[in-house]
Amino acid sequence: MKILIIGPSWVGDMVMSHSLYQQLKQQYPKSQIDVMAPDWCRPLLARMPEVHKAITMPIGHGAFRLMERYQIGKSLRNQYDLAIVLPNSFKSAFIPFFARIAHRRGWKGESRYCLLNDLRTNKNDYPMMVQRYVALAFEATQVPKPDDLPIAFPYLQTQADEIAQTKAKFAQKLTATENRPLIGFCPGAEFGPAKRWPHYHYAKLAEILIEKGFAICLFGSKKDQIIAEQIRLGLAEHSQRYCINLAGQTDLNQAVDLIADCRAIVSNDSGLMHIAAALNKPKPLVALYGPTSPSYTPPLSKQAVIIRLIDGGLIKIRKGEAKEGYHQSLIDITPDRVVQELNQLLAC
């Protein structure tokens, strides 16, 4: 069986989709799984052994461009037996429809009745995103109940020689850590500061860990450079040499390798958090949640500890009450609490 997946457009969602690919291989061992996704996803898909081929989706997130979708779909005709559409948007279902793939499966989303012929409507029965993904591996009449759904955690393959090569590219920066074990911080998050643990808490945590003999490596995209530098500059001058700001200086592939080299990770609810959770050699991970809900998109790792001080589901907010836009529930998570959780994880 040849299967086309229309993949998600976010790092964390792409990582979690690996659970679906594993389940498809369990059910159809000889299947060929191709994933259409944005080009930046290739480094992640290359680390998922179940994926046969990554197909670049040239249309940007949010763009409609119907005729281009038609041409892409037409180019894929007579190649696939099954299509699974992971995004909920109406437009994401066009390419399998135009490709005339016989079986087109996905959740109802934006009322895609005319485009998908295996439309699932009971999404609320599966509260976790990874459950919704894995449920699509099954025929409509054979989907297990949520508690019985087999969930294989995502795992991104890493190789010691590739990690060493990546470290060599950043050797000049990393030598400043004087061979101290690294703790990685992922201080960024999409959709504004309400999802971020305050930079001054990260700085205090870094001071404590540096005193304990660790070094700190800050990861993130170019958008996270300023917040990461605020953390570094928040340290005492003699401690700054042990805090390396790599935000915006790595590509996604390099970030995976360098995160894999860390002794542990502290992260906001972000794509990098899901990457840290999904390494094939799991790392101790402290995941910090505020208004977003770990009951929907938790880090899928037995080495992860979640800290969240409020109950309930998602709170739709992009800016918190504090001056910097931080959410009070994240402000209330103290560095000492994070140190306590890290100590327990590192002792295991």
UniProtKB/Swiss-Prot annotation:
Highest taxon, organism lineage: Bacteria
Molecular function as annotated in GO: ADP-heptose-lipopolysaccharide heptosyltransferase activity
GO cellular component: cytosol
EC number(s) from the headed UniProt entry: 2.4.99.24
Pathway: Bacterial outer membrane biogenesis; LOS core biosynthesis
Keyword Transferase: yes
Gene3D superfamilies found in the cross-reference section: Glycogen Phosphorylase B
CDD domains: GT9_LPS_heptosyltransferase
Enzyme class: transferase
GO biological process: lipopolysaccharide core region biosynthetic process
Catalytic activity: an L-alpha-D-Hep-(1->5)-[alpha-Kdo-(2->4)]-alpha-Kdo-(2->6)-lipid A + ADP-L-glycero-beta-D-manno-heptose = an L-alpha-D-Hep-(1->3)-L-alpha-D-Hep-(1->5)-[alpha-Kdo-(2->4)]-alpha-Kdo-(2->6)-lipid A + ADP + H(+)
Knockout mutant characteristics: Mutant synthesizes a truncated LOS molecule and becomes attenuated in an animal model for experimental chancroid.
Pfam families, sorted: Glyco_transf_9
Record keywords, A-Z: Glycosyltransferase, Transferase
Function comment: Glycosyltransferase involved in the biosynthesis of the core oligosaccharide region of lipooligosaccharide (LOS). Catalyzes the addition of a heptose unit to the heptosyl-Kdo2-lipid A module.
Matching NCBIfam families: heptsyl_trn_II
Family: Belongs to the glycosyltransferase 9 family.
Misc note: Can complement a S.typhimurium mutant lacking waaF.
Protein's recorded name: Lipooligosaccharide heptosyltransferase 2
